[in-house]
Amino acid sequence: MKVIDSISTLRQTVNAWRRNGESVGFVPTMGNLHDGHLKLVKKAKAHNDNVVVSIFVNPMQFGANEDLDAYPRTIEEDKAKLISVGADAVFLPSVAEMYPAGLDAQTFVEVPGISDSHCGASRPGHFRGVATVVTKLFNMVQPDDAFFGEKDFQQLQVIRALARDLSMAVTIHGVPTEREASGLAMSSRNGYLSKEEKATASAIYEEMQRVKAGIEGGNIDFSELEDAMVTNLEAKGFKKDYCQVVNASTFKAATANDKELVLLVAMFMGKTRLIDNLQITR
């Protein structure tokens, strides 16, 4: 596996593959890799001759009071995991390599509409940071295919929109959420949880399944289902950020006429913010 820290070397590597007629898959990450990330790499390997994985903790997508400094960095462990699943190159740029003029002078990319609600409302500027860094990485790697987890469903839709709207020649693949045996969605931030908190956190998935069963059983009082879920989780010590059944395309509150829905959830367990979602077809 090639270990690359400069944009110029990354481009040389990809261009050499291209000259050989080989395809390129891409998996952007912030590191601290778990089985969910490795599943993305395996999917990319199944689709492409070569796979690039980036590890970059992107300061542009963190707010002033968020966990940029505390975010776990486990580069050596990450490299070993990537070798084990057959990644061909890992791109490890510095902040200076990615933003040579500094964050304040950086041109940015913003996806209107779907960036504004839910995680976008809770974390102002977050999706602007995501859209900007992903656009830069796509321009560097020029992948045929890029792979993202469905756990960050809103992020996935933002990236699909920017690729479509900016006429990018990349196919975006969403990969189903990888879960622990308890149902808890795998996340790098799960490492912040104590053993007891982690056991309790599995209740999010249990409650989401209850909402899904209610909707599939014909209940269209979405507010009632949401409120019951929040009440049950708050009784277990969670604090609500948001919990809403939305139209899967617009992210607006679901109506009785909508068929493709997604339940979007963000809850705090202590200081740790946990997000999850469940797609539902009526």
Curated annotation (Swiss-Prot):
Subunit structure as annotated in this protein's UniProt entry: Homodimer.
Listed name of the protein: Pantothenate synthetase
Record's miscellaneous remark: The reaction proceeds by a bi uni uni bi ping pong mechanism.
Residues at which (R)-pantoate binds: 61, 155
UniProt-listed HAMAP family: PanC
Pathway noted in the entry: Cofactor biosynthesis; (R)-pantothenate biosynthesis; (R)-pantothenate from (R)-pantoate and beta-alanine: step 1/1
The keyword Transmembrane appears for this protein: no
Active site (catalytic residues): 37 (proton donor)
